[in-house]
């Protein structure tokens, strides 16, 4: 399973660790906040709608940040924009720790979200461009597993801070603690370079990426369906991640048991990332995503709607992490293979972050709906609808496994697959261009 890493070049390994650590940091900062929400609710007397807005606003503005970072990355390089993203969201995370009111915290979280948006699309594009097509799914899937590491660290740090410090101070220290991993990530990224694929594209006569790139009808089909797919995946994921601590608290789960439950889900997500990474290269991106989405639909329904004993809750927690979160390992390679190099991160950033911001509406939606039907029912309702939307998007997108990424040409608006230019001519099937 790790053959791809052992056979990789020094630059490929540096790129892997740079992207892995950055994604772990992104997850750490984002998930830390979800574990602080119960404390903030008590300290500032917030209602569920206000809590939902705090949880949603950073996710919504990631669309702007991701789109902007994608454009800058296509123009000025992947490596330097990855550094800028880390500095940006760490800075505003620190400032959030100094907030004196709900309104100030809302502003800092909004600005922090701009940095979050840039990390995923730019890192995914960089990885896609440096890794052998035969191993792209595995390598990018392992990068995605950094999310599980960041999540687990967030659980541990938040739990320790809330146990050792008064709640009105613990949440501030939690925001400030992001400086430590950010410094480590910046150290790792100091020698990472842009890919040869990107450099060749930048020196070619290909048109420069701009805000108008995502409006070009050549990319309309792939861009729209990719966004629909991400909306479904993110709506389900955030309905679970943001509200899970509150749900466990509502079910009177003891603090120690809550930590164990979330860690089991994080372990499940790591296993899901690894499995999805391997499967996406073995059987394809679409079958992997569809299978895990259906699995997520079933286990989420069980988790939210069934009366749970300890044993069943443990099993379902693992399976929710494995499917609902693990499936994201197949998303990075899938989207990176939809668009040509000169607009790759612009289009990926738009699809991923628009999908993320729209999908994040589930956080507010769950908060509002829970006042009428209860939190578990609200979470379950949004998750089931979300995964149905995701499957719809997947079914209408082409399979791209094994495609040589430098050969992807401009998409044909009338075709179901990207146009791929090969040494022998132009084909309209991604499968036909597999090495």
Please provide the spans of the model-predicted regions.
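Glycine-rich segments within core transmembrane alpha-helices of 12-TM secondary carriers
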Residues: 137-158, 352-362
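Extracytoplasmic gate region of multi-pass secondary transporters
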Residues: 34, 219-273
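Helix-breaking motifs and short loop linkers at transmembrane-helix boundaries and internal kinks
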Residues: 45, 77, 98-104, 132, ...
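Helix-loop-helix hairpin linking two adjacent transmembrane segments in secondary transporters
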Residues: 143-190
